[in-house]
Amino acid sequence: NLPQAIQEKGREIRTFMPKWGNINERRNQLHEVIRLSGMNLIIDDTDHPLIIKVASIQSARMQVYFIDNDDYFQNRMQTADENGVEYEDNDSRAVFYARGVLETVKKLRWCPDVIHCHGWMTALAPLYIKKAYKDEPSFRDAKVVFSVYEDDFKNTLSDDFAAKLMLKGISKKDLGDLKEPVDYAALCKLAVDYSDGVIQN
């Protein structure tokens, strides 16, 4: 277990992940962190409350932060429902997750040396870190690594995806040759373009 091994060498590891619908809150002893929750993220002109829950992996002495929102993650899986139908708002979910993680790290006043992004749901984080959050003390000196997995979605993202992901500090030029509709390969390429290192499975 890589995070545990790094933690045992005296480094601090914090894990952030979406609070998928199949995660049992009672069994895993998740609890909401009120001081971190309560912020609204505006995506596509709509307010979405950011709820932060935390659990501990006792054996590794490591905390896991769960990014939650009733609309995007409650009772929902990673990419598709139980019938294999992909969620139409996967693009908004990815925007919410990436921004939710970065806002939580800011609130924690934590300055990670390395931010390791795993899979397509994290693909917007490298762009946000290098452009929209580049002057934030938490991210100013951080290196970003993106791991590509075979966790692809089959459909394209919504036609207004580029507009949804825009934040202050990001220009259309920063999106390079991102053409809509955006598919899995184009989304991963955007992540790779803004990462300091890439790991391919």
Residue ranges with predicted function:
Residues 1-201:
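Catalytic cores of nucleotide-sugar-dependent glycosyltransferases that transfer UDP/GDP/TDP-activated
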